[in-house]
């Protein structure tokens, strides 16, 4: 009887932990409101888009894919799945929110505050803006 009780408690504990992880991973990633006030010092800088593309192709495509659709070769094994940078959900975020996410990260994505300097992170933001989905109404 004691073995059965211990087994039930152990299974219940594992189920609880798995459900907690699942809930966290399905929670939308929202930057704090303060991130919306961060201004992009490179907004409109065409050269920064090219620089961001080089960084993106070296560091981001493995998860986010070459077109930013979240379909890189590593994406299948990740939970939560990588963001689709062409999506309306990403594109409607402020530059500051995207910059904050690049800086801080959230598992499985690392934060890049130490990998990229501030200018490089803004270059990535500008390149991600260039990835927006084509307008289908035209």
Question: Model-derived features: where do they sit?
Answer:
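Sequence/structural segment immediately N-terminal to covalent heme-attachment motifs in c-type
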Residues: 46-69, 75, 98-104
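Bacterial N-terminal signal peptides
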Residues: 9-19
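Bacterial N-terminal signal peptides that target proteins for export
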Residues: 1-11
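Electrostatic cytochrome c docking/interface patches
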Residues: 26-55
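Signal peptide cleavage region of secreted peptide precursors
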Residues: 20-25
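Short, flexible, mixed-charge acidic loops at enzyme active sites
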Residues: 28-30, 73-78
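Short, non-ligating residues that shape and space the ligands of small metal-coordination modules
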Residues: 69-70, 118
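Extracytoplasmic electron-transfer domains, predominantly the class I c-type cytochrome c fold
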Residues: 79-131
């Amino acid at each position: 009887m004691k073995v059965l009780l211990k087994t039930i408690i152990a299974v219940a504990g594992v189920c609880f932990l798995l459900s907690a992880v699942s809930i966290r991973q399905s929670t939308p990633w929202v930057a704090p409101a303060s991130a919306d006030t961060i201004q992009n010092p490179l907004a409109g800088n065409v050269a920064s888009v090219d620089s961001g593309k080089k960084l993106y192709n070296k560091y981001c495509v493995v998860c986010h894919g070459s077109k930013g659709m979240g379909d890189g070769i590593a994406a299948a094994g990740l939970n939560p799945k990588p963001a689709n940078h062409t999506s309306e959900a990403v594109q409607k975020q402020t530059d500051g929110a995207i910059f904050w996410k690049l800086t801080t990260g959230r598992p499985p994505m690392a934060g890049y505050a130490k990998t990229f300097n501030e200018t490089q992170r803004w270059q990535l933001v500008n390149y991600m803006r260039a990835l927006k989905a084509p307008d289908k109404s035209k």
